[in-house]
Amino acid sequence: MATLLRSLALFKRNKDKPPITSGSGGAIRGIKHIIIVPIPGDSSITTRSRLLDRLVRLIGNPDVSGPKLTGALIGILSLFVESPGQLIQRITDDPDVSIRLLEVVQSDQSQSGLTFASRGTNMEDEADQYFSHDDPISSDQSRFGWFENKEISDIEVQDPEGFNMILGTILAQIWVLLAKAVTAPDTAADSELRRWIKYTQQRRVVGEFRLERKWLDVVRNRIAEDLSLRRFMVALILDIKRTPGNKPRIAEMICDIDTYIVEAGLASFILTIKFGIETMYPALGLHEFAGELSTLESLMNLYQQMGETAPYMVILENSIQNKFSAGSYPLLWSYAMGVGVELENSMGGLNFGRSYFDPAYFRLGQEMVRRSAGKVSSTLASELGITAEDARLVSEIAMHTTEDKISRAVGPRQAQVSFLHGDQSENELPRLGGKEDRRVKQSRGEARESYRETGPSRASDARAAHLPTGTPLDIDTASESSQDPQDSRRSADALLRLQAMAGISEEQGSDTDTPIVYNDRNLLD
């Protein structure tokens, strides 16, 4: 048996191990297409600001081809460094594209104010054609989808500080798009707006240079469809992280935005580790979780072997990302989601509608959190030197805190309760039909008698005993239906008062002409 277990562990490790690169074969290269990237040919701030202005106009042109749009975006992304050409050549290693750098300098003879640097060759016409200044129709179209403030005609500046602020504002809006361009483009607008408000409050961006929605949609769609552009952006992030010492302000802002980009598309894997394993609830000892715990261990080792590109595997379209999906550990993932919904209010908005979602293990996670509230881990307490008296004090405080949190009914536990009017009879209520209808009426009658004879506390227990137990919970309402025992008791008392008042009103209905209306304050006081 011991040999079998060792073989099983070795099999799991080798199964999830990435392929070993061998030196016998060469690298597989695809059919490359050429991307032209304009870069400043001198150190003048005027040249850089004018190039930035022309590239922003170019991206807003709806007639721009995909490779040309990618080259313009790469040119903008590399404008904040001192030598953009060296940066692009150092970090670019793409088997699908071949990048050609074109140095741009100022020119008074071209309509765009720029020309391509060359030795004795007039390149003004080519520069105007590239920046779409040869056709007046396309020139007018290039102004659409630019800044929300229509009073801004251009962004050419002379001082480095002003240029860095404008460039940083534009770059922040581009980098934020990468966070959900691949994983959730339909719901990206709200999170992008929150990031924009954050950086505006921190004075990292200038609010007047907010780009139009259509311009941002064009860039988001290009990021989503062009893997080469995403490879360049990830390589630039990693290059900035490797830079020692103090970094430029724009580089620090890119690293800050990276916190929203990193591990995009890996929420199931990360949250399962966070809520399913790190919480260390005793439910992990179930036999059902043994195989999936071994799978998660292998995936964590594989994640570390992938190195610095592991958090970006979904953005880089790495085929190994499928191993990290929740379908590889459905029971443990369902349990972790139940734990997460109880511990964090932000988890209540997640979509659990997956084919492999198991409501039973979801409720197991919820119940595990509720019944373990206020308990102190003996292992952790011994490591921290917490005495038994301190542990009891912590448990008491934690229990009061949990009760206060439940009484406020925050997050996914908040349920909507509809109250009856005095003139509404049982015949007007929605009919369940058959045995369920008779069961509900019987439970109501028993609850009223129990309330009148024994009081609200024992009546609530009698009502709880007649609750149906065979009905499965809906996925979206699982967290609302399962309440804490004390919270359920309060709700039961309130509903029993409601039913009692409704019964009294039915008996007095013939004597009174005006129906009695009860609100929540009268019922719950």
From Swiss-Prot:
Residues 418-525 are annotated as: Disordered. Pfam families: Paramyxo_ncap (PF00973). Residues 477-505 are annotated as: Interaction with the phosphoprotein. The keyword RNA-binding applies. Residues 1-36, 373-391 are annotated as: Homomultimerization. A motif (Nuclear localization signal) lies at residues 70-77. A motif (Nuclear export signal) lies at residues 425-440. It is found in: Virion; Host cytoplasm; Host nucleus. Keywords: Capsid protein, Helical capsid protein, Host cytoplasm, Host nucleus, Host-virus interaction, Phosphoprotein, Ribonucleoprotein, RNA-binding, Viral nucleoprotein, Virion. Residues 404-525 are annotated as: Ntail. The modification Phosphothreonine is found at T279. It comes from the Viruses. Residues 433-452 have a biased composition (Basic and acidic residues). GO terms for molecular function: RNA binding; structural molecule activity. Residues 1-403 are annotated as: Ncore. Phosphorylation at Thr-279 is required for the formation of the nucleocapsid. Residues 1-375 are annotated as: RNA packaging and organization of the helical nucleocapsid. Signal peptide: none annotated. GO terms for cellular component: helical viral capsid; host cell cytoplasm; host cell nucleus; ribonucleoprotein complex; viral nucleocapsid. RNA binds at K180, R195, Q202, Y260, N351. Homomultimer; forms the nucleocapsid. Binds to viral genomic RNA. N0 interacts (via Ncore) with the phosphoprotein (via N-terminus); this interaction allows P to chaperon N0 to avoid N polymerization and non-specific RNA binding before encapsidation. Interacts (via the Ntail) as N-RNA template with the phosphoprotein (via C-terminus XD); this interaction maintains the P/L complex anchored to the nucleocapsid template during the sequential transcription. Forms the helical nucleocapsid (NC) in a ratio of 1 N per 6 ribonucleotides, protecting the genome from nucleases. The nucleocapsid (NC) has a helical structure with either 12.35 or 11.64 N per turn, approximately 20 nm in diameter, with a hollow central cavity approximately 5 nm in diameter. The encapsidated genomic RNA serves as template for transcription and replication; encapsidation by N is coupled to RNA synthesis. Forms the encapsidation complex with the phosphoprotein protein P. Before encapsidation, the newly synthesized free N protein, so-called N0, is chaperoned by P. Ncore is globular and carries regions required for N self-assembly and RNA-binding. Ntail is an intrinsically disordered monomeric domain in the C-terminus. Belongs to the paramyxoviruses nucleocapsid family. This is Nucleoprotein. It comes from Measles virus (strain Edmonston B). The gene is N.
